[in-house]
């Protein structure tokens, strides 16, 4: 199985979160995973994945304009219809709108025909309703949350298999 994590990152915080998720995916089993900044996506690789996870810093309680534009321009080229999808976000402030950013990406994926997943509260704590959120000032403190999310997403991908 193959997965891609595609993100925008201004200060490398969202990039670090993507790396944590990749750790979790690898813990789940035999999953090849690669992370891409939206400036350097390998379209050949991504068109062959079974799952795509998107991440964005939160800006004005939403995804960055750069991420929104990238999704609108590029997502059709990726052939993600029917593929598993998920989303995550980082933010600078508590209640900075990261859940709105995650919802925006999830809705976009659903409109494009992807099957979205998070695990919700079915696995117990940590409960990850829509997708993980980490504070940029201390992203390392959220490492385990992102790793857990990656592992849960990976297990779902392998079940879907």
State each model region's role.
Residues 2-3, 9, 13-16, 20-161:
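FMN-binding flavodoxin-like domain, especially the glycine-rich phosphate-binding loop
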């Amino acid at each position: 199985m193959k997965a891609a994590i595609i993100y925008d990152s201004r200060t490398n915080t969202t990039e670090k979160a993507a790396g944590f998720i990749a750790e979790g995916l690898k813990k789940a089993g035999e999953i090849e995973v690669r992370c891409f900044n939206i400036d350097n996506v390998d379209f050949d690789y991504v068109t062959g994945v079974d799952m795509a996870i998107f991440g964005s810093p939160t800006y004005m309680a939403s995804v960055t304009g750069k991420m929104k534009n990238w999704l609108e321009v590029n997502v059709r080229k990726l052939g993600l219809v029917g593929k598993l999808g998920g989303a995550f976000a980082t933010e600078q402030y508590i209640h900075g709108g990261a859940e709105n950013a995650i919802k925006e990406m999830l809705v976009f994926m659903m409109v494009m025909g992807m099957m979205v997943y998070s695990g919700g509260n079915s696995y117990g704590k940590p409960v990850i309703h829509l997708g993980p959120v980490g504070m940029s000032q201390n992203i390392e403190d959220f490492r385990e949350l992102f790793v857990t999310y990656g592992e849960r997403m990976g297990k779902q991908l392998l079940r879907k298999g």
